[in-house]
Amino acid sequence: MNKARKTYVLKLYVAGNTPNSVRALKTLKNILEQEFQGIYALKVIDVLKNPQLAEEDKILATPTLSKILPPPVRKIIGDLSDRERVLIGLDLLYEELTEEDWEAQSNL
């Protein structure tokens, strides 16, 4: 039987090609490739080029990372360098636990 794989849809709002924007994108791509390789879609939105998109999504600061799917929508504003903080903030940390993790926890 073919199991449907969950896809994570994220948007990263940045302001131009600033050091903060570049660092946020690089860090986020590293996290996504390590944890969700092949099961994510990331759209990078430059709010200087597309201010209407930022306004529609009520983005007030950059960088802002928004998880669109799966629900619920979650947002993280600012520094994305702390992997665990990003995963918890987006409500993704617990979904990465494997069966072995669950077994190890139940044996405690």
UniProtKB/Swiss-Prot annotation:
Any Pfam family matching the protein: KaiB
Keyword rRNA-binding attached: no
Assigned keywords, A-Z: Biological rhythms
Effect of residue 23 to A: Induces a strong decrease the interaction with KaiC
Source organism, top-level taxon: Bacteria
InterPro entries: Circ_KaiB, KaiB-like, KaiB_domain, Thioredoxin-like_sf
Alphabetical list of SMART domains matching this protein: KaiB (SM01248)
SUPFAM superfamilies named among the record's database cross-references: Thioredoxin-like (SSF52833)
UniProt GO BP: circadian rhythm
Function recorded in the entry: Key component of the KaiABC oscillator complex, which constitutes the main circadian regulator in cyanobacteria. Complex composition changes during the circadian cycle to control KaiC phosphorylation. KaiA stimulates KaiC autophosphorylation, while KaiB sequesters KaiA, leading to KaiC autodephosphorylation. Phospho-Ser-431 KaiC accumulation triggers binding of KaiB to form the KaiB(6):KaiC(6) complex, leading to changes in output regulators CikA and SasA. KaiB switches to a thioredoxin-like fold (KaiB(fs)) when bound to KaiC.
Domain-related comment: Has 2 forms, fold switches to a thioredoxin-like fold (KaiB(fs)) when bound to KaiC.
Sequence similarity: Belongs to the KaiB family.
Protein name per UniProt: Circadian clock oscillator protein KaiB
Naturally occurring in which organism (per UniProt): Nostoc sp. (strain PCC 7120 / SAG 25.82 / UTEX 2576)
